[in-house]
Amino acid sequence: DAKAANAWLDKIDNPQRALEVQTRRATLLARQGKLREARMLVQQVPERGPEDARAKLLAESQVLREVKRWGDAHSILVAASERFPGDADLLYEQAMMAEKLLRIDEMERVLRRVIELKPDHHHAYNALGYSLADRNLRLSEAQELIEKALQLAPDDPFIIDSMGWVLYRTGKNRQALE
């Protein structure tokens, strides 16, 4: 219930958490169909510096993703990536929204850029490898990417699942089940 959730949020009196609180409020509003109001709530949080500006853009895109407004979220993330060039995490989020919009070439290009900027970004290796395997393309490359992700985060269940998928796609059914 949105009213009860807002009552709990009212109890948080910490300026350091203002964006987090407003993002949660905005998500509640967006789920009620009040998207314009939700976005304004996030946009009106005061910025103390560039990191706050970046966080606000991520928060607004998160609210949009919650209500499956992939195109709007993607637009914000593209603008954020232009404003904060070289930010691997923003680029990763942009790639994930490109994938939702079926802009696979963009997703692949941006994920490769993420890996270039941040060679230990296991999510980027996994997303790219899984995407290739899911489309049954360049399976040896897909497996290499997922193996790299697994080296970086050996206990990540999503990466373990991706490895099973690529092994299945390459006909290694017994290994896939392990």
Positions of PLM-derived features:
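Alpha-solenoid helical repeat scaffolds
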Residues: 1-178
